[in-house]
Amino acid sequence: MNYIHCLNNISAQGTDLLTSDYELTDNIEAAQGILVRSAGMLDMEFSENLLAIARAGAGVNNIPLERCAEEGIVVFNTPGANANAVKELVLCGMLLASRGIVGGIEWCKENAEDPAIGKTAEKAKKQFAGREIKGKTLGVIGLGAIGAEVANAALGLGMEVMGYDPFVSVNAAWKVLPAVQHVTDLADIYRECDYITIHVPAVSGTIGMIDEAACALMKEGVVFLNFSRDTLVDAPAMASALASGKVGCYVTDFATPEVMAMENAIVLPHLGASTEEAEDNCARMAVVELMDYIDNGNIVNSVNYPACQAGVCPEGMFRIAVLYNSSDLAMGSVTEILEPIVAEFDMVDNQRDEHGYALITLTENLADEVLERIAELDGAYLVRRVK
């Protein structure tokens, strides 16, 4: 029996997919897999039973990825599962920033007792006059699952769209409509766009990237939208740009004390993926990834190990997985152990940065002492009998 622990409430649309070989448990120490949304895991100590963590969502800055990798724990996320939900809120954010909607709603609430509010509103509405987004230029920084959907939807609303992503995958690039203008210099986005939305992960190269220098390059009165991570934007730089009018409005899904003090900021309480559909999609995807890894050893959508797939282990065959440091361990050392023992085996071996993963399907079931010999090799994080 495999045990799964949920650190957050996970949609039953996902947990109902668990087969009879799986059982939910409140005992995290016994769990082979953990399902998580936003719970903080950075300071957690992990049991030796734990094989994998699946994040029902895209962001993984609540999980210690490198430490997990070194402990042989594969971390998954669910890219694209919440893309439509976030896309819709980005479009909403552009409209909120453009049409005086927030101020108009507040005015109506403040004047709710006015018996002649209909006539008064006709006089007051001019202070909330806005601009249409049709014909304006949107810059999309990051053309992954969410960025691609935002770019395509903006085209449908009559906007000109520019996209920047030096790391875009081939699969992601195919999802972006040809009318999206790809640029190779981020400064072009800053200089030419009326609206800018950012959709990149918070990593060492992107944290604080929207700084004073970036804001200085932007068009006067630009609307900047951040539905990715709060740390991408340097708060003092954004506050200064808003105060000067360089940035006309900052729309963010991340409420912080610094942002709440900014003028002309529209702040939402992290609603990007907060829809029933997104939560269901993320939960289903996370559970499928977790089971496929535990049952078959396949890795799809990991954020700390390479993708590696060998399908379902055929009847009558056996399979082991080796998680290792590719700087210290070469798979030749493993084959040297296996070749005198096993008549035939097939290996799929991939690396991601310094972390490697090998799936080995064999005609014979290996004795425990053979697995122990592999596990004792320098650089081996974990050797697991999959089947």
Model-derived regions, located:
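An N-terminal-biased, well-structured beta-alpha scaffold segment characteristic
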Residues: 1-78, 211, 217, 234, ...
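Rossmann-like adenosine-cofactor binding region
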Residues: 42-44, 166-259, 274
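Oxidoreductase and adenylate-handling cofactor-binding alpha/beta cores
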Residues: 87-106, 152-159, 285-298, 335
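Glycine-rich Rossmann-fold phosphate-binding loop(s) that bind the pyrophosphate
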Residues: 143-144
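N-terminal Rossmann-fold NAD(P) dinucleotide-binding loop
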Residues: 147-148
